[in-house]
């Protein structure tokens, strides 16, 4: 499992993201356990020259956080345009589409996927995990809002205990989970 340090996360400089964001800038200042942006930035620094998929970006703040390590490439997906694609950062590519329809993904380069999709009902998340299993992809999945409602709690509780880590104290107040997906 991933070792995390709350003080280290709290000390991360998030000014680069705050300066580029067009909405919700104050959330980058939030301490771990309230917002997950510092956790995302920290995790992006744990590997280099990989691809990170940000699924459900809305206003782009998750992609900005995940882009902290400039050696990685972030591909950010949203079904509808909500303004994020106006943000310019050299290691972020914005796509207005369902990531499952993107034939350009080089799956062997993808190390981390953030799933933060509406509605948070556990069904969409399950569909996406099934899709990734069909692709035979393995890596780290970050799941947002795992304690938001009964449906998400049920979804989270059905995942294998030995493959998951509840990191809510470092992430978002409504629940953040890490899933080691298809890892042996």
Predicted regions and their residues:
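A short alpha-helical cap/connector motif
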Residues: 1-114, 118-184
């Amino acid at each position: 499992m991933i070792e995390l340090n709350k003080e280290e996360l709290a000390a991360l400089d998030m000014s680069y993201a705050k300066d580029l964001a067009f909405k919700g800038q104050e959330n980058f200042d939030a301490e771990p356990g309230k917002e997950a942006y510092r956790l995302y930035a920290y995790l992006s620094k744990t590997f280099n020259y990989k691809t990170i998929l940000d699924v459900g970006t809305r206003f782009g703040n998750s992609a900005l956080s995940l882009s902290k390590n400039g050696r990685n490439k972030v591909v950010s997906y949203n079904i509808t345009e909500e303004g994020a694609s106006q943000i310019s950062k050299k290691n972020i590519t914005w796509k207005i589409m369902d990531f499952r329809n993107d034939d350009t993904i080089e799956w062997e380069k993808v190390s981390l996927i953030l799933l933060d999709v509406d509605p948070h009902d556990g069904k969409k998340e399950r569909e996406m995990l099934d899709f990734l299993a069909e692709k035979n992809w393995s890596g780290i999945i970050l799941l947002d809002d795992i304690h938001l409602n009964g449906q998400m709690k049920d979804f989270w509780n059905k995942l294998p205990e030995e493959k998951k880590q509840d990191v809510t104290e470092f992430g978002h107040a409504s629940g953040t989970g890490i899933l080691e997906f298809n890892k042996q």
